[in-house]
């Protein structure tokens, strides 16, 4: 949301609408329904995805009107605060980890395991039976990834990162990489990925035009999947929603909230996110 507002998306030079209410994610109660939607949905506690995707008015408001499938029932016991983080971060994490099928017994490396998406991805992978490895930076970051379920944690800036990872696995490669910085890490990824492994990349902010080691990846038949939750197919989204619901029902996800501000402090919330100095999501409340 901050990057979209600030014009930080590659190729996007101007806002698509003259007036915009920002934000894609949120949670709340359905107060009214349109034609064709069962009236029984009124009063349902829901979380929202793609609130401001290709439309002018997003979730930084008291009300939003959306297609019924974009309002997903919150599992019993899941708070609105947790639900507000499920849209982009939750769907990204669960699809990046489980979009290729079960990971039980597999080795999954999560890049940036202390970030909002990364820490959720660590939890998803661990709860799904994977051996989880994660990179982070600093004592707090490494502890955050480890507390989420990573069996092995590494400083992502280490010069010998690939060697450290392979030492931790006894020389065995990793089957799946959930990648927040594709360009920065692709050389390391090519060294540690298994044959027919997958790199599920949802970011490359530090290198937006990466040079890819094509042959090392090709001769392992590596799949590179670029994850953009806005464009998941209907089947992929239903699967991701189902996986999220199952994990929430098991209380397997710990959503970190850094700060909750009133809606009137929306600009301040953007400033907090832009500084990067936070440990969790920043929410707006009404």
What is the role of each PLM region?
Residues 6-52:
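Glycine-rich beta-strand-centered segment in the early N-terminal region that forms part
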Residues 15, 39, 47-112:
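NAD(P)H dinucleotide-binding glycine-rich loop of Rossmann-like/cofactor-binding domains
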Residues 42, 84-158:
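Mid-domain Rossmann-like dinucleotide-binding core that forms the NAD(H)/NADP(H) cofactor-binding site
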Residues 45, 107, 131, 197-198, ...:
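Short glycine-centered segments of the SAM/dcSAM-binding site in methyltransferase folds
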Residues 112-113, 181, 204:
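NAD(P)H cofactor-binding loop motif with strongest signal on the N-terminal glycine-rich segment
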Residues 160-171:
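Short amphipathic alpha-helix with an adjacent loop that forms part of the alpha/beta core around
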Residues 184-252, 286:
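Glycine-rich phosphate-binding loop and adjacent beta-alpha segment
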Residues 235-286:
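C-terminal hydrophobic helical "lid"/dimerization subdomain
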């Amino acid at each position: 949301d901050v990057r979209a507002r600030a014009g930080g998306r590659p190729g996007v030079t101007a806002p698509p609408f003259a007036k915009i209410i920002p934000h894609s994610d949120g949670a709340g109660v359905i107060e009214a329904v349109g034609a064709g939607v069962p009236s029984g949905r009124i009063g349902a506690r829901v979380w929202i995805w793609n609130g401001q995707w290709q439309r002018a008015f997003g979730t930084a408001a008291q009300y939003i009107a959306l297609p019924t499938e974009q309002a997903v029932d919150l599992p019993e016991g899941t708070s609105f605060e947790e639900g507000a983080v499920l849209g982009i971060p939750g769907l990204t994490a669960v699809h990046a980890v489980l979009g290729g099928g079960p990971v039980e017994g597999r080795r999954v490396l999560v890049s940036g395991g202390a970030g909002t998406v990364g820490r959720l991805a660590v939890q998803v992978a661990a709860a799904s039976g994977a051996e989880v490895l994660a990179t982070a930076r600093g004592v707090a970051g490494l502890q955050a990834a480890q507390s989420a379920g990573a069996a092995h944690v590494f400083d992502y800036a280490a010069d010998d990162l690939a060697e450290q990872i392979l030492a931790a696995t006894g020389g065995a490669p990793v089957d799946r990489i959930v990648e927040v910085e594709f360009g920065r890490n692709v050389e390391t990824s090519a060294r540690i990925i298994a044959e027919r492994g997958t790199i599920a990349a949802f970011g490359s902010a530090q290198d937006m035009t990466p040079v890819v080691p094509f042959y090392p990846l090709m001769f392992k038949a590596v799949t590179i999947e670029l994850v953009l939750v806005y464009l998941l197919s209907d089947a992929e989204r239903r699967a991701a929603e189902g996986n999220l619901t199952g994990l929430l029902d098991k209380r397997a996800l710990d959503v970190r909230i850094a700060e909750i501000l009133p809606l009137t402090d929306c600009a301040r919330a953007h400033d907090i996110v832009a500084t990067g100095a936070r440990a969790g999501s920043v929410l707006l409340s009404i």
